[in-house]
Amino acid sequence: MSGKPSKPSSPSSSMLYGSSISAESMKVIAESIGVGSLSDDAAKELAEDVSIKLKRIVQDAAKFMNHAKRQKLSVRDIDMSLKVRNVEPQYGFVAKDFIPFRFASGGGRELHFTEDKEIDLGEITSTNSVKIPLDLTLRSHWFVVEGVQPTVPENPPPLSKDSQLLDSVNPVIKMDQGLNKDAAGKPTTGKIHKLKNVETIHVKQLATHELSVEQQLYYKEITEACVGSDEPRRGEALQSLGSDPGLHEMLPRMCTFIAEGVKVNVVQNNLALLIYLMRMVRALLDNPSLFLEKYLHELIPSVMTCIVSKQLCMRPELDNHWALRDFASRLMAQICKNFNTLTNNLQTRVTRIFSKALQNDKTHLSSLYGSIAGLSELGGEVIKVFIIPRLKFISERIEPHLLGTSISNTDKTAAGHIRAMLQKCCPPILRQMRSAPDTAEDYKNDFGFLGPSLCQAVVKVRNAPASSIVTLSSNTINTAPITSAAQTATTIGRVSMPTTQRQGSPGVSSLPQIRAIQANQPAQKFVIVTQNSPQQGQAKVVRRGSSPHSVVLSAASNAASASNSNSSSSGSLLAAAQRSSDNVCVIAGSEAPAVDGITVQSFRAS
């Protein structure tokens, strides 16, 4: 055997190492509770058992102390250790302050005890006794009696409807009421109700983000350029709105400017400014660095107003306000596409607004056209669900105006645009919904007056090959610079051709342009006659309701049947216009010479 002491083999025996309670202590404890004859063996066994249990309790308490990241063992740790071992904790030993123990000895004994403080009974008797708080009780009172609030202390003083309305629209008024004591709510008796205790509450002022001098100057220049008469400057301003990443602080003011501008110009029937404001909306939507979701409550009503408003211009029968409605419809579709979520249900709410106009027989025809245009831009499923079932109702609305029984030229023009819009958006959907053959009689029974024309359009769509279908886009508002004699004009109409046809031989694309809506200028028609091939012999008529301005001819058409010599000699109209200014015909009331086999004529509309 080695000289090293042997380690204990059991946990209980390991607990005997270190300090332990002696057998004499156990005898003293036994005598204190009335057990006088305790043998030495029993005292020894009890001392060992008590020492083991005390050490385990102290070890567990130390664990609680370490978990609590404390360096000092507390009474709470001992209590938690006792609870873990299913032992009822000791009570009466919890104190916030440190309790000093006093040492005393005498008669062969050493005692530790706490020294009690001396209490002066005279001081206690002289002080006023504290009132015992009352128990919590519930008491009922009448809040309203037959719709009238009684004037009792438990009820707040009633406020008049005028003061409630003022508080709702102007939150700052509450701070003024706190300063003025007489501005409290008036009871029903008419007497001023004064409060005994007046409390001053400081209301935090509404925070407004102030713009720097440079930002204010930029905002002023941008807004003036966007609604001004200088077209190149407007194009630069719109380009800045669509690409500048530092417009976050000015975005609330921009949206408010657009919303207030639409309100004012709709009342004044200023079509040009409404177009400019919608172009600002388009520029803001195209800016990838702006987050417009917080400002849709101002933009959506403005765009919706330009779509379904009853009148947008001074002369609805002549001015081309239909282009603005189409452009605003595309803006609304873009807003729904970008910001529609399962939370806000934006597209569902917009669709519900448009569909209400189709359900009401009192809706103005201009508003009806705007609703149809807005629904048609939201996709084929929307057309299938909301427009197709109401075709017969719409047909009955516009039939009297198209047959000449209506005396209003405005309604007649609106009915014609509604028919054109339906013939444009419905045939592709009807081709999918209905199977061939298509008969005019069936379409008339299902869709009324518009049935035969829709049947012809559906048959044309079925027979036309997919590669030869030319899609004519609605009137858009172009923000690109315009190369013409009138540089400050604004493009309203645009015909878009497929990419495969732009690589062919020259054709014609009409770009009517307006500068501002002038009240003293009648409408015009531009007739463009092509002479290159027999297939292009039919004249294209484009109506516009603005003052006469320049016509820019660009090269885009399908000329597969044109001869090689003619194609090589004619070239592109746009290239010819760049080579010589004589190749661009700017006409107002006279006939122009032919340019590359194309004759352009302009005449007054009757």
Swiss-Prot record:
Give the classification, highest ranks: Eukaryota, Metazoa, Ecdysozoa, Arthropoda, Hexapoda
Q: Which GO terms describe its biological process?
A: RNA polymerase II preinitiation complex assembly; transcription by RNA polymerase II; transcription initiation at RNA polymerase II promoter
Give any GO molecular function from the UniProt entry: protein heterodimerization activity
Q: Which residues carry this modification: Phosphoserine?
A: 546-547, 550
The superkingdom listed in its UniProt entry is Eukaryota
| Name of the molecule in the record | Transcription initiation factor TFIID subunit 6
Question: Which gene is the coding source of this polypeptide chain?
Answer: Taf6
What Pfam families has UniProt attached to this entry? TAF, TAF6_C
Which keywords label this protein?
Nucleus, Phosphoprotein, Transcription, Transcription regulation
Its job: TFIID is a multimeric protein complex that plays a central role in mediating promoter responses to various activators and repressors.
Family, as annotated: Belongs to the TAF6 family.
Q: Which GO terms describe its cellular component?
A: nucleus; SAGA complex; SLIK (SAGA-like) complex; transcription factor TFIID complex
